[in-house]
Amino acid sequence: MNQNETQWDKLLKIKTTGRDDSRSDQYRYPYEPTQYCVLERLANNGLITKKNVLLDYGTGKGRVCFYLSYQTRCRSIGVEYDERIFESAEANREHAVSGRKVSFELTSAEKY
């Protein structure tokens, strides 16, 4: 695990590091968070501002939502179908620095 990944999680007061293959199969992908270096490039390109609402399908534990809401001040909505992972995202939201700008929906992308 990259030190940068751990540092950002600590700063944002969330727990999103590590891969989880426990529920992956031919129809479902494993939980694997987007690297912070990728999110940093996205945040710095100027396309997302505080006037935007970010919609993150397959949000997992919410890393994309928390980071981009923190960096750009946008509002974020994460959509997750796996109840166990969704509960981790909600637990993160309770403590996250940007938690008030983030919400999660437990449903499939098709139904949202």
Annotate each language-model stretch with its function.
Residues 1-49:
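S-adenosyl-L-methionine
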Residues 51-60:
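Conserved class I S-adenosyl-L-methionine
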Residues 62-66:
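Glycine-rich SAM-binding Motif I of class I
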Residues 82:
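Conserved SAM/SAH-binding beta-strand->alpha-helix loop
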Residues 89-90:
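Conserved SAM-binding loop
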Residues 98-108:
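Conserved SAM-binding strand-loop segment of SAM-dependent methyltransferases
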Residues 110-112:
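Short loop/turn elements that flank and shape the SAM/SAH-binding pocket of Class I
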